[in-house]
Amino acid sequence: GEFKNNHILIGPDVWRYNEPNPEFTEDAHLFKSWRVKAAQEGLRIKVGRWNVAGNPVAILVDFTSFIPQKDQILTSFWEKFQVDSLTGQWDYIEPVLFGYTAGKVIESFVRYHISPRQRIIAQFHEWMTGSGMLYLKNALPQVGCVFTTHATVLGRSIAGNGLPLYDPMKDYNPVETAHRFGVDSKQSLESKAAEWAD
């Protein structure tokens, strides 16, 4: 529709070893020269379109090549943004690596395709992509970053455990509550993403 190829969606390439993703059609001609540059930068991506109304441009990101660097990546988020990843298990680390890699993909695309006068907004949904937003805030601060959460980590944890959510909200200490429910790292990333968003 209205945005044509200026609205680009990014998702994880979860079908990379199986049959083709039925929701995605790769397009070898779309951003062809940038894809070559991205590959030279160590980014493994597929570019094409989602098979939904409007067929928006989509980039699928294979983040697995960054798994060996996870400790350095998590350390950098602590040093730059004080994101506490110490208690994060694989259900935390995997989304952090996806978000980080998505941020690197956006950085590569912007540096290759976008003039300094063009305005770019990158929107990140949920804590699972917050690392991408934080990466961009450091690497390309000129990109406007929006962070959207549809339900917070703590809100889900509180409600999911049958506790009252809205009336006693002021009584919940975020750090203590996150620790109580074992979501310290997720809550830390989410709160830092919200803090650093534009």
Predicted segment positions?
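Catalytic cores of nucleotide-sugar-dependent glycosyltransferases that transfer UDP/GDP/TDP-activated
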Residues: 1-198
